[in-house]
């Protein structure tokens, strides 16, 4: 399984001849190396409904006939826009032809904001994502605060790599993320959701230096690891 980071919270997984994107915020993302028009994808996994995570989902899904796996309310909202979806909810799992997906808890919000009409649409509970293929497991925490049930996620799953937000302000910051890394017990931890905007500026190298009992890995946009 090849796992690539593409800035903010964008993660690409290549496994069994399939390409999976998590939270494909590409257009307007100053930290990504990808252009939406160049992306080929078979499935899109969404952690929640905020614009910096849904991103280019509708365009990508329609162009590639890709299925979008998302929390129920968000999946329903996207299906009304002509997107092929597979709704799930926290605690649920499903075996797809590209791998197994399970949604975990996350402490955050989830909504679609229409600036023009000044409306906010609730898009369900936010989630973390466990993805398993080729006997390897990836944990994408989504946007979240630190929460004690991360210990349970670590106990129940043999996590090979965890992507954890460190930006603070909207999610947990580096200090909380160090504790999260300890609790989820991943072999490798990659920081995400930082330096995209001034309010979430952090030093990822300082973060990985503080990690214990795991390998910390800072990935620049376009860099990858193989599990």
Swiss-Prot record:
Lineage, highest ranks first: Bacteria, Bacillati, Bacillota, Bacilli, Bacillales
Family to which this protein belongs: Belongs to the UPF0173 family.
Q: Name the NCBIfam families for this protein.
A: PRK00685.1 (NF001911)
Q: In the UniProt record, does the keyword ATP-binding occur?
A: no
Q: Report the Gene3D superfamilies cross-referenced here.
A: Ribonuclease Z/Hydroxyacylglutathione hydrolase-like
Keywords annotated in UniProt: Hydrolase
**What SUPFAM superfamilies is this protein classified in?**
Metallo-hydrolase/oxidoreductase
Cite the PANTHER family for this sequence. UPF0173 METAL-DEPENDENT HYDROLASE MJ1163 (PTHR43546:SF3), UPF0173 METAL-DEPENDENT HYDROLASE MJ1163-RELATED (PTHR43546)
Task: Tell me what organism the protein belongs to.
Answer: Bacillus cereus (strain ATCC 10987 / NRS 248)
InterPro entries attached here?
Answer: Metallo-B-lactamas, RibonucZ/Hydroxyglut_hydro, UPF0173, UPF0173_UPF0282_UlaG_hydrolase
Name of the protein in its database record:
UPF0173 metal-dependent hydrolase BCE_4747
SMART domains, per the entry: Lactamase_B (SM00849)
Q: Which GO terms describe its molecular function?
A: hydrolase activity
């Amino acid at each position: 399984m090849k796992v690539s980071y593409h800035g903010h919270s964008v993660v690409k997984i290549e496994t069994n001849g399939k390409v999976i994107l998590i939270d494909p915020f590409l257009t307007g993302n100053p930290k990504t190396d990808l252009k939406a028009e160049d992306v080929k994808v078979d499935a899109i996994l969404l952690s929640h409904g905020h614009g910096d995570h849904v991103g280019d989902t509708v365009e990508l899904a329609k162009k590639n006939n890709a299925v979008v796996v998302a929390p129920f309310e968000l999946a329903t909202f996207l299906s009304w826009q002509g997107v092929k979806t597979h709704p799930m909810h926290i605690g649920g799992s499903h075996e797809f032809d590209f791998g197994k997906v399970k949604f975990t808890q996350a402490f955050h919000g989830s909504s679609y904001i229409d600036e023009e009409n000044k409306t906010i649409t609730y898009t369900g509970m936010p989630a973390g994502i466990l993805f398993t293929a080729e006997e390897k497991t990836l944990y994408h925490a989504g946007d979240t605060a630190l929460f004690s049930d991360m210990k349970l996620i670590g106990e129940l799953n043999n996590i090979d790599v965890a992507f954890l937000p460190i930006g603070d302000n909207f999610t947990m910051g580096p200090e909380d993320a160090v504790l999260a890394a300890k609790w989820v017990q991943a072999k490798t931890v990659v920081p995400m959701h930082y330096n995209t905007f001034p309010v979430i500026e952090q030093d990822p190298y300082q973060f990985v230096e503080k990690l214990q009992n795991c390998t910390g890995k800072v990935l620049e946009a376009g860099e990858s690891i193989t599990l």
